[in-house]
């Protein structure tokens, strides 16, 4: 083996070289193309050009191998071209119009009328003060059918209530009075789902003294909305009451009867029944009417057909551009506008299996006809009837296939050419397999829809990615196969020309190869360090000017490293220089056997690294950048496109309003009704109204009227008038005393009266003790006062003393005037008294029918002459 390794060929693979040192013999490194790409170095030596292009940053390791000559111990052969399978889109797509249905979770809403009488029995206690409620009993009783007919015709209701409790019949009268007809008046407080009408505002009564038990009967008629959910076995109202009977219950039916927990006598069906609208007074058209008598109320509603009123499915979306993609075991309905894809079985679904789904064909046909008329009537024709498929998640898809006019004409011509028309494909009904979205019942199947359509959006995204990736992989496989076949042909030819390069490329490492007929002998190569290689810049043979080398020449030596693959028998030759030439693809050839006669105008390019070396006249000239030489590519372009952007659109199957209305009872309506019920009365002050014992006197008046006839009625009226006056006075006093401000005012008045009484008492006592001083203050000096000195006047320097009797005269004059005033006051008082006495006497005579005498004309009081004279003065 060592002897075989001595016969070696040297292959040098230089990718991105490292810097090489050079000596006087022309040892050089590899030129970095970044430094010499745009520079013409001119006519310089090969070693100088190589040395000036030393790279700064080696990228690919330089590896040089010495290969032994293959002997045939290891042989290889090339495979034959394969047949390439062309990947085609095997999916079958059909365009059309789709209408998607979902489960109808909304309750069935209808109008009902509630009839009942609200009975309130109140026991109160009062003792000339505010009344106190000691007991209260409230109940609701139903109204019988005959009175309901009167209510719906005339709008009046009786104040009497007859009801059955504890196996006994009871009667109640409003205000404890005789039965009478009262009009139904609207309640001012109402909501969008309820309207109420009633007959009275008074619910509690009392009297001023003692206990009183009274009864009020309020006839109530309410217009309400009722709700019922599938399977429609009961319904609820805004009042919070639930009725355990189906809204579609009827006695006259040939099929199974609907749910009801009531006896038959409680349910009535009336044909051609007319109802009066209590708000507008209009009579509605006659309809079949149902009445149900409950323990607390009677309820009425219009009879309805179940199949015409409700549907278990509702239309969700309309898709004008839908694509049905056929896979091996399923259909995928792609809704691009909605970014969703629904998968289903390949067999159509029979909608006759569904319970209460008669509305689906009608709605689907109307929607598809409208879309086709707006968008496709001039460009497409319909292909077959509407088909229904049960999609994943509980969605029913109504699909109408479409075909363009050109394609339809082509099919028609082909059918006529074959002398027959295409038969419509028989519709295969869906198998009886069970799905998670289909529930069976005694009356039929029912579709249940998932509350989220996220899975459909993910399915759409997956189908888009799957289609794109499958197309990409198919193109890759086809291109790869064709490329391999083309390369095989080239390699079969290359093995004849240069088996070393071919086998090195195939094995992925430098090898030596030799053609042995139709097979190739291969042997490994030994790596030589790049520091042991020296190149020369002249291609002329020394000693013979007519002969030249066909490729650049070089000198190399083996490595002395212990890791070297060189044989131990040749270690003594590691310092020997071995002559060689630069081969193709940066390979080193052993020996210098490639020669030719020197030619004139010689010009050659040899690959070295990433660039080419230009030789003219067998002498190195310059390095040429590879980009300056036009490249002929044999690369096959791969037909692949990048995924397009896809924005997901949030899809909400059920809106917030739909989810809120899923229950039988609406919490908002119940709360609003309770609040309205508590505040139904128009005047809150009339809730408690005092009776004041009128019932007792009314009974006395009725007794006189019934026993004494007309005289008794007159006497009863007098008694009632007097009693009313007395009761009003007593009630006024009691009300005044019960007022806290009245007590405060009375206290203040008492204090002021006491103060005024004390002042008057003091004045009278002073008047009795000293009348002159009280009446004429200052006229008499008080006791102990010294006499006032006489005043003197000086006139003409003479002193004149005033007479002291002048003061006495003034005092006497004042006293006389005071007496005169007192006399006048006394006369005035006597006259007024006399006039009042005369008036009283005349009134007595008038009542006694006594004739007037002459004495009556005389004055009642004689005045003395001195008084008349004084009065004249």
UniProtKB/Swiss-Prot annotation:
Residues 1-21 form the signal peptide. The gene is gB. The chain crosses the membrane at residues 741-761. Its main location: virion. GO terms for biological process: symbiont entry into host cell; virion attachment to host cell. Envelope glycoprotein that forms spikes at the surface of virion envelope. Essential for the initial attachment to heparan sulfate moieties of the host cell surface proteoglycans. Involved in fusion of viral and cellular membranes leading to virus entry into the host cell. Following initial binding to its host receptors, membrane fusion is mediated by the fusion machinery composed at least of gB and the heterodimer gH/gL. May be involved in the fusion between the virion envelope and the outer nuclear membrane during virion egress. This is Envelope glycoprotein B. It is found in: Virion membrane; Host cell membrane; Host endosome membrane; Host Golgi apparatus membrane. The keyword Signal applies. InterPro entries: Glycoprot_B_PH1, Glycoprot_B_PH2, Glycoprot_B_PH2_sf, Glycoprotein_B_ecto_C, Herpes_Glycoprot_B. Residues 418-447, 781-807 are annotated as: Disordered. Residues 124-130, 206-213 are annotated as: Involved in fusion and/or binding to host membrane. Pfam families: Glycoprot_B_PH1, Glycoprot_B_PH2, Glycoprotein_B. Keywords: Disulfide bond, Glycoprotein, Host cell membrane, Host endosome, Host Golgi apparatus, Host membrane, Host-virus interaction, Membrane, Signal, Transmembrane, Transmembrane helix, Viral attachment to host cell, Viral envelope protein, Virion, Virus entry into host cell.
